[in-house]
Amino acid sequence: MSGVAGREATLLAFDYGEKRIGVAVGNSLTRSARPLVVLQNRNREYRFEAVGKLIDEWKPDALVVGLPMHPDGTPHERTQLAKRFGNQLNGRFNLPVTWIDERYSSVEAEAGIRSGTRQAGMLDAEAACIILQQYLDGLSLEGPSDDHEFR
């Protein structure tokens, strides 16, 4: 099995929230991510229909989901919701899911919007972009890693 470090893979990342879901797209070869869209999290049917359209359009090799944690690393009240969302993505779309600690991603996105380096109105997508960039930055330059393999 080949890891992403040595090959090109398209990735979609999600910053799951009870009202909105931020989405970003990235590429493992260029190790770059960009904000894509903010989906309204109206209900399960709407949520997965919207995600399905993005998956059909972008044809990702894998998905990344931000995992909310407290600053001390303990699970957040929303941690289980994000885990369930990631498991549902895996079950519905048969794509591998990796969870990334998303501590401070929204804070960083807000700071970027205030400074003008990030897009206003896209806070959740900007947070997803930060989550995905953290994942991409963590890919080993030396070759495949069991932690980041797509099956």
Swiss-Prot record:
Record Pfam families: RuvX
Any one of the GO CC terms: cytosol
Record's keyword terms, sorted: Cytoplasm, Hydrolase, Nuclease, Ribosome biogenesis
SMART domains the UniProt entry points to: YqgFc
Keyword flag Transmembrane: no
CDD domains: YqgF (cd16964)
Biological process terms in GO annotation: rRNA 5'-end processing
Coiled-coil parts of chain: none
SUPFAM superfamilies for this protein: Ribonuclease H-like (SSF53098)
Keyword Hydrolase: yes
GO molecular function per UniProt: nuclease activity
Catalytic activity, EC: 3.1.-.-
Disulfide bonds: none
Location relative to the cell: Cytoplasm
Membership in a protein family: Belongs to the YqgF nuclease family.
Its biological purpose: Could be a nuclease involved in processing of the 5'-end of pre-16S rRNA.
Name assigned to this protein: Putative pre-16S rRNA nuclease
